[in-house]
Every structure is written in C-alpha cells, then in structure tokens.
Amino acid sequence: MLWKSFSSVWNHYNVPRNETGFDFPGKDHVLNIAHRGASGRFPENTMTAFAAAIEAGAQMCELDVQRTRDGAVVVIHDDTVDRTTDGRGAVGAMTLDEIKRLDAGIRFGDDFKGERIPTLEEVLALTDGRCGLNIEIKSDGVEREFCHLICQMIVSHGALATAMVSSFDWNVLAVVRDLEPRIRIGLLASRSPLRLLNAAFEMRAESINPKVDIVTEELCVAAHKRNLNVYTWTVDEPAQMRRLIAFGVDGIMTNYPERLRELMG
C-alpha cells in the first residue's frame, strides 16, 4: 500500500533525471562513498582513513563534525571522545589543543598509535582535488553559528562542486540552505521514506540518504522522478551492493571502498 501512495502523490510530476549531481573522475554509475573514510581497515574519521579511502577508489568521503569548546570544527562521530580515543569527556567541553593531544588510533590497534582527531579544515585540504566530502552535522544542540562555520569552510576551500552537508535533523539543513544556497544538502533517514521524499523535494536537496533497510527499487524510481539522488548507508557486503545497484541507487556508503571499486570493475 505504501508504494501505491507514492504513485498517487508523485505520478503527476515529470521532472527530468538529475544531470547536475556529483561527477567525479572515475565515477561509473554509482558513487563510491567511504563511510568515515576507509574505516573498516583504519581508525574512523582520521587522516589515515581518508587517505586510504582515496587510494582505495573512493570518490567521496563521509565524515562527522563536532564543535570544541573554543569553536573549532573537528571530525569525530560521537559527542564524546570515549569510544575512539584514549581520553574521556565531551568534545564540546574540550579545547582544540586538548582534543589534539588525544590518540585517535590506539583503540584500533598499536599500528595506528599516534593518530590525531583532524579538523574539518585539515580534511578539506587533504581531499582537495582528490575526492568529495559528505559532511554530516549531528543533530544535538546545533547552533546556527556552527553551520555558518562549516559553510564558510566549504566556500573558502572552493568545495561547492565537490562537498555536501547531510543530517538527520532536517532543520539543520534548512539553516545551511538559508546561509549558503549553493551548498548541496542530503537528508538522512532510517524510516518513513515517503516523508523523506516529500521533504527532500521541497528543500531542493541533492539527495536522500536512506538507511539500507528502507531502500527499494520503487524508492529509487520515486526519488529520480523528483530529481533526487539516492545515497544509501552503510553497506559492506558485495552481494548487498549488487542488489542496491540493481535497484538504481546513485551512491553507496561503505566502510570498505575497495570492495565497491572491485565490484564496479
């Protein structure tokens, strides 16, 4: 019944397929998006993981950003440093100097001891001309000033054509769009595909970024009719990658970008 509702809502539209999406060198049908870098083999959200992702064939790296007490934008998934570093405490309660003293590799193994939490500026510099970025803004207590900082960095690094901002909090994306309409946005969701399509279309988003569990061929068709790309997460098994490619997804976020590269030939 859900897909009958899709048809009734969308069948009177006839929007051409997106011809202005990301088009990186080597992109062949499906965008290879490294989830927190090549995080299956390297410490997530580190410079090593991003460099390895590029080497493994990723055309885009997905990452997460948080803000330090003194206003720096750092690349880390959690709002605390407990899980991924040798420290403890909230990211927002620490200065950048304190964050930089933490070891972001030791929990992944002794071979990665000494890895540091990078700033967004550092990752933008590393990936410049090498791959795109999907910058996820977490949903808790995000301020307009934080969004403004991220927009400024994207513009100042000349990354408007290769970067996008995504979030589960679509209000955050509305703020980003208000601050800098040229920045592409992607709406994250783990449920309610019809609501996701509606919101993304109304916001003129680059993409919907649905959890793999809710991706179907019908969803991809409906998204494409709305001029929306479908970037799904997080997919590590080649068999599942093949199925999603057959459905018509435009991008796959994976912890193992080398697997998607091999599958794509």
Language model region names:
Residues M1-G265:
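Phosphate-group recognition and catalysis centered on beta-loop-alpha active-site segments
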